[in-house]
């Protein structure tokens, strides 16, 4: 089990990716042949997606702004005997080309537009992108991806079962309707 955030930052929208949603993303990406070669997990948090991709054989780079979250990810990787390159940097600095980006980025609930730099970086640097997003943002996401020169190659509903992790949460658990998107830059595949 990969631990969650020890001190989740509200402004960074740090929520651990629910295991079932992580499994869905990794399974679909793996079945599509997208976890072979170089993979980046943008906004990797404590490493749930990055470590899953590494377990499946990908050469993974986990990118995260929060050093404390990366410390948890590093420890989980060491405990599992997995190799991941961890980078503490803002996603806006990401420019390395990889075969695939996997991510559960901030959704913009606390900071409107927080998801945009992740989508921009992913579509600019990867041949294939797998992203978990709230279903309520579907129209925006499709338009924005098109504006960035990308295309939605697939979309699947995913229930995101979120546990209470922040002081402002009023319930112990909440299920959010999410969508797993498979995105391509125009001209890819």
Give residue ranges: language-model regions.
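Conserved SAM-binding motif I beta-strand of class I
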Residues: 59-64
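S-adenosyl-L-methionine
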Residues: 1-40, 51
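Conserved SAM-binding loop of SAM-dependent methyltransferases across substrates and taxa
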Residues: 46-58
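Conserved glycine-centered beta->alpha loop in an early N-terminal alpha/beta scaffold
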Residues: 43
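Conserved SAM-binding loop
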Residues: 73-74
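Conserved short alpha-helix immediately C-terminal to the canonical SAM/SAH-binding motif I
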Residues: 68-69
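S-adenosylmethionine
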Residues: 89-182
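Conserved SAM-binding strand-loop segment of SAM-dependent methyltransferases
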Residues: 81-91
């Amino acid at each position: 089990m990969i631990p969650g955030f020890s001190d989740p930052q509200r402004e960074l929208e740090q929520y651990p990716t629910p295991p079932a949603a992580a499994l869905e993303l990794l399974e679909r990406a793996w079945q599509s042949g997208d976890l072979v070669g170089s993979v980046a997990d943008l906004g990797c948090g404590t490493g749930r997606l990055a470590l899953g991709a590494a377990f499946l054989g990908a050469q993974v780079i986990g990118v995260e702004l929060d050093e404390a979250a990366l410390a948890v990810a590093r420890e989980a990787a060491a405990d599992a005997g997995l190799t991941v390159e961890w980078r503490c940097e803002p996603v806006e600095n990401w420019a390395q080309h990889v075969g695939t980006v996997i991510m559960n980025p901030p959704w913009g609930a606390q900071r409107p537009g927080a998801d945009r730099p992740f989508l921009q970086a992913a579509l600019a640097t990867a041949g294939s992108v797998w992203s978990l997003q709230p279903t309520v943002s579907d129209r925006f996401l499709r338009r924005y991806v098109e504006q960035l020169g990308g295309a939605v190659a697939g979309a699947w509903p995913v229930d995101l079962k979120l546990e209470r992790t922040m002081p402002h949460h009023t319930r112990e658990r909440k299920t959010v309707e999410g969508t797993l998107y498979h995105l391509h830059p125009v001209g890819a595949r």
